[in-house]
Swiss-Prot record:
The protein's enzyme class: transferase
GN (gene name): plsX
Keyword Cell inner membrane recorded: no
Source organism of the structure: Lysinibacillus sphaericus (strain C3-41)
Protein name per the record: Phosphate acyltransferase
Keyword Iron-sulfur: no
Length: 330
């Protein structure tokens, strides 16, 4: 698999990006990486590797840049050149921890949509208490959505869960304010009816409070709601660990308890660690475009690269393309 990697994207770039790339090259035998970035900033962290190629770029898409303008004007940026490589067939997938809006805009302009997918969705695997995780989409690619957008999200999620997660009949849930069939607003009510008729293992409405308990394998929602849920989970997990740390450090007795519970706490942290789950995929494009977390460390970059490699090896995109070609949504 040939991966185009943005070496300049993210809070910890290029150090963590390069470290994650080298780790991936060690563990994924068929992987070849094209690293795009400003050579003078990449070189201090580079190690020679026969499957790592440096592609010098003069510009960088900053987090503060206007997404559409950055893609159009910064043509020699690491992010733009990375997506050009996919568009021109020189890479099978691309990955960046940089500006999310610019990556989505570039994905649409350069990589292109799959025919039949009106609006791509941002999807990622989120943690569950049993450690298996669940796929959720859309996480913010489109703040507004219609029922005919959400049904393809469910189809793409179903294919991903089967191909990558190895599930035979993924449970598809529609995020709602209640589990009853007629709950929700016009969007969820209409989407519910369409999903009920689709050739999917649709289990009905699911509530946000049940997500981390693994109520569904794939959860579908609009981008506005999905983004709020994602950030609520991230914020709650961070606050919870801070409170636990404060509680365990409050006295000698609690410090001893913390030592005794060390393995249990490590397991809990492992389950809730976003670096284990890879990045967010922009589903609905003609090639895998992966967005790693902006604060990704080397481990998170490695996980995102592994995710891209798995998507290519399991032909996720071609399966989505073939499936939606034969589906009509009224």
């Amino acid at each position: 698999m040939k991966l185009a990697l943005d070496g300049m994207g993210g809070d910890n770039a290029p150090k963590s990006v390069i470290e994650g790339a080298l780790l991936a090259l060690e563990q994924i035998p068929n992987l070849e990486i094209q690293l795009y970035g400003q050579q003078e900033k990449l070189e201090p962290f580079l190690k020679q590797h026969d499957r790592l190629t440096i592609v010098p770029c003069e510009e960088v898409v900053e987090g503060t840049d206007d997404p559409a303008r950055a893609v159009r004007r910064k043509k020699d940026s690491s992010m733009a050149r990375m997506m050009d490589a996919v568009d021109e067939g020189r890479a099978d997938a691309c990955l960046s921890a940089g500006n999310t809006g610019a990556l989505m805009a570039g994905g649409l302009f350069k990589v292109g949509r799959i025919e039949g997918i009106a609006r791509p969705a941002l999807a990622t695997t989120l943690p569950t208490l049993d450690g298996k995780g669940f796929l959720m989409l859309d996480l913010g690619a489109n703040a507004d959505a219609r029922p005919e957008h959400l049904v393809p999200y469910a189809i793409m999620g179903d294919i991903y869960a089967k191909k990558v997660g190895g599930l035979q009949k993924p449970r598809i849930g529609l995020l709602n304010i209640g589990t009853e069939d007629k709950k929700g607003n016009e969007l969820t009510k209409a989407t519910f009816d369409l999903l009920k008729e689709a050739n999917l293992n649709f289990i009905g409405n699911v509530e946000a409070r049940d997500l981390l308990e693994g109520v569904a394998d794939v959860v579908v929602t609009d981008g506005f709601t999905g983004n709020m849920v994602l950030k609520s989970i991230e914020g709650t997990a961070g606050a919870l660990f801070s409170m636990l740390k404060e509680a365990f450090m409050s006295s000698t007795k609690t410090k001893i308890s913390a030592v005794l519970m060390k393995n249990n706490l490590r397991d809990l942290k492992h389950k809730m660690d976003y670096t284990e789950y890879g990045g967010a995929g922009l589903f609905g494009l003609q090639a895998p475009v992966i967005k790693a977390h902006g604060s990704s460390n080397a481990k998170a970059i490695f996980s995102a690269i592994r995710q891209a490699n798995t998507m290519v090896e399991h032909t996720v995109i071609s399966t989505i393309t073939e499936t939606v070609r034969h589906i009509e949504i009224d």
